[in-house]
Regions:
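AlphaC helix of the protein kinase catalytic domain
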Residues: 153-165
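Activation segment signature within eukaryotic-like protein kinase domains
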Residues: 173-174
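Protein kinase glycine-rich loop
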Residues: 52-58, 63
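Conserved short submotifs of the Hanks-type protein kinase catalytic core
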Residues: 137-152, 156
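C-terminal lobe helix-coil module of Hanks-type protein kinase domains
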Residues: 230-326
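ATP-binding glycine-rich loop module of kinase domains
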Residues: 38, 69-113, 117-118
Length: 403
């Protein structure tokens, strides 16, 4: 159970210890033991993973710094150890569950297994945690992932001079995360706790999503510790009569974009039920594209049935800039609306004169026609008389005589 040849490795960062118990790199004192609720330092799981210092105890799991002897590299091990219903008795490796929580514990453990097996299947996605092993042991379940270094989005924003960033910069950060969210939702996984603290800006340029836990940690009606994040927790997570859905993550994700663009957290969801105003200072609003503001409005609707319902829909709204819409229109014809009754054909005004107003009465028209006929007849008669009365010929003879 214990690996002797790791005695000279730091149990926090796994760098070699040069002298003494304090790591010169991370400052961890290796004489410090884990609390008795957790497994001791240098415990080995699966004859492969050496457990180090406990980094955190989250709602559903203890998170250990660890070392993978097969890969000869640090890793992170999550042990399903839900707060309030399970612990570990001193000297025992097996997890101890309070009897009245046994049934719930078994259900939560299945949820934990499903969550991390799904994460392992999706580990190649840009924003996903690189999980590579899930296994049962010690009456519980463990999930192993590669360590992910990065700066939380909240910390990054606080380092900027204004406390917020322009949309063009935010777009590069956020849009790949939507692809990962969409894949998770397609597999039935709801994150339920997306915040600026759980979005990591990594050295490789990717933004990764951390803070995953089973869904039961993200609703008030659960036996487990509720992960409340004011401004980011959706109204359905406060309400026993509503269930989480993909729109729950859309709300939190939109709130993160709002924080990045505006520089402050949105109001918490319960307060918005009585005062639903998301104020953006004019100076900032002028720099945010109109279609992005509309997309945030769709993502931050209080009630889930009124929100953008999927990551794909939110992506469409965020991409709805006029130039993007024009490009999309060239690539594919949009759905055509149902045909409507067409009005009677109109004359082509480009090639014909406008129709003239009709006479008021048919009698006037007949009179005019008769007059025209009479005039034409009179003229014809006059020509006949003149031509055959000798006047023309006499005029010609006179001309000839004068010559």
């Amino acid at each position: 159970y214990f690996l002797k040849n790791t005695d000279r490795l730091c149990m926090n960062c796994f760098a070699p210890l040069t002298a003494g118990s304090v790591c010169p790199g991370c400052g961890f004192d290796n004489d410090q033991e884990n609390d008795t609720s957790f497994l001791p330092l240098r415990t080995v799981l699966q004859d492969r993973y050496v457990l180090g210092h406990v980094q955190a105890w989250e709602s559903d799991a203890a998170v250990y710094a660890a070392y993978d002897r097969t890969l000869q590299a640090p890793c992170v091990v999550r042990e399903f150890l839900p707060k309030g219903i399970a612990n570990r008795l001193e000297g025992n490796r097996e997890v101890h569950v309070r009897e009245r929580f046994r049934k719930n514990f078994d259900g939560y453990k299945r949820s934990f297994t499903t969550l991390w097996q799904t994460m392992m299947q999706l580990r190649t996605l840009a924003a996903a945690l690189p999980v590579y092993d899930v296994f049962p042991a010690n009456e519980t379940v463990y999930a192993v992932s590669q360590p992910v270094d990065g700066v939380p989005l909240r910390e990054f924003l606080l380092r900027t001079p204004e406390g917020y960033i322009p949309w063009e910069q935010a777009r590069i950060m956020f849009m790949p995360v939507l692809t990962t969210l969409e894949a998770l939702h397609d597999r039935g996984v709801i994150h339920g706790s997306i915040t600026p603290d759980n979005l990591l800006l990594c050295p490789d340029g990717k933004v990764r999503l951390k803070g995953f836990c089973i869904a039961q940690c993200n609703t008030v009606q659960s036996d487990l510790e509720f992960n409340l994040n004011e401004g980011y927790t959706a109204i359905e997570q406060y309400d026993n009569d509503r269930k989480m859905c993909p729109a729950t993550d859309i709300y939190a994700f939109s709130a993160c974009i709002y924080r990045a663009l505006v520089g402050s957290n949105p109001p918490d969801a319960p307060s918005r039920e009585t005062n639903d105003k998301l104020m953006i200072p004019n100076k900032i609003a002028e720099s945010i594209p109109t279609h992005v503001i509309r997309a945030l409005g769709a993502g931050l609707q209080i009630y889930p049935e009124n929100r953008a319902q999927s990551a794909a829909r939110l992506r469409e709204l965020l991409n709805a800039a006029p130039s993007v819409v024009a490009q999309a229109a060239q690539a594919a014809q949009p759905p055509q609306p149902e045909p409507k009754p067409q009005p009677a054909p109109q004359p082509d005004v480009r090639h014909s004169a406008p129709p003239k107003e009709k006479p008021k009465g048919g009698k006037n028209k007949a009179v005019i026609i008769i007059l025209v006929v009479l005039i034409v007849a009179a003229v014809a008669a006059g020509i006949y008389v003149v031509k055959f009365s000798g006047l023309v010929d006499g005029r010609e003879n006179t001309t000839q005589a004068a010559s």
